[in-house]
Amino acid sequence: MARFPLVPTAPEPERAILVGVEWRDNAWPLDRSLDELERLAHTAGAQCVARLSQRLVKPYPKSFIGSGKVEELCGLVHRMDADVVIFDDDLTPSQQSYLEKAVGEPVKIIDRTALILDIFGLHAQTREGRLQVQLAQLQYLLPRLRGMWSHLAKEQTRGGIGSRFGQGESQLEVDRRLIRNKIAALRREIKQVEQRRDVQSKSRIESSAFRVALAGYTNAGKSTLLNRLTGSTVLSQDKLFATLDPTTRSYRLPGGRGMTITDTVGFIQKLPHGLVDAFKSTLSEVLGADLILKVVDASDEDYERQLEAVDRVLDEIGAGERLTLTVFNKIDLLDSVDRLSFRRRFPEAVLFSAQTGEGLDDLVDRIAREAAATDVLLSADIPYREGALITLVHEQGTLLHEEYLEDGVRIVAKLPARVAPRLERYRTE
């Protein structure tokens, strides 16, 4: 008999081989892109055991990589006892099917998009988030159904990366017509959620609160910034895509001006277009903001490329022309020389540490200044019977002059742009 009770052990992580291609016009160095792919694989529960790379002008139509590299990959899979091969670029359904036959069962072949979708499936917490992930997964799977029929039963029993798509659902067991019907049904459900969100957003729009949205590369520290600023306890982890569902918190700026700040899903290079499309309702929080804080990990050597990736996604969702403020986070990890370099190169940006709180006062001051810049200077004679409007000016505006007249109050005040129209009929200038 055992002297100690047996403790259940965690399942062994899947052994993954990463495959990357160095293209002539690579925006990122291949090794850095594969580093990020390895972090994605780790987030999904895999252990990277080897890497394989090739320099190409364009992918091979049948196999994506050359035949010699396919043979090398097969040998590497055997030697490393790999469970899954992850490509850093998108594979066509026929390329994926060819490679699966080449390496042999039970090894899985997936691409970067499938890996990101898998992580989203793990991290979606709300009904809206799960609906959006299911939609993106089904859109990805639909053109791949032909090659999946022979592997479907095995995938569902093997588990692990690439097999969590639609867990608990039967959509993979039905034909294309039913898949399309499911996609249509998900779109309708998401539309209903959007309508409820629109009601909530309209309520926020009608309030005088200055609306701020956090946007940035995944793991740049957006959730930690939200927690540091508002004193909340939003989940913050050193993992890619730890936050999928938008979270809004309230904050009062110096002088009493109200503010809402919303944390949103992180961006990443090669972000699948299907995810951008599926998460449009979530990303609409960025579109509705008065100010977008672009949060950047200053300690990452690829911070400039990450900032470019964020700008591309903002452009894609129609937020490229919105008012933005760049916040370089994690400056506690920089030495004095690097900090000085950032200040010289980005004089309009805020240097900040969500971990230690350094730079918090500067950040709040910059947000307050941006909020004040959107205010409207207004003079009005408000009749005494409109006591609610007079109170509104005192509570929501900055009163510059107040004079009591025989039939009302003459005020000169700076008011939030969303409040000023309520006084328009009494305006005197």
For each feature predicted by the language model, list its residue ranges.
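Conserved C-terminal guanine-recognition region of P-loop GTPase G domains, centered on the G4
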Residues: 26, 32-42, 70, 74-79, ...
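Flexible beta-alpha connector loops of hexameric P-loop NTPases
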Residues: 24-29, 59-63, 123-129, 171, ...
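Short alpha-helix plus adjacent loop in nuclease-associated cores
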Residues: 114-133
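Short, ordered loop/turn segments at secondary-structure junctions
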Residues: 23, 53-54, 89-91, 112-115, ...
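C-terminal-of-GTPase-core extension/linker across diverse P-loop GTPases
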Residues: 1-19, 23, 38, 143-220, ...
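Switch I (effector-binding) loop of TRAFAC-class P-loop GTPase G-domains
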Residues: 2-4, 197, 203-210, 228-260, ...
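N-terminal accessory targeting/assembly segments
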Residues: 1-116
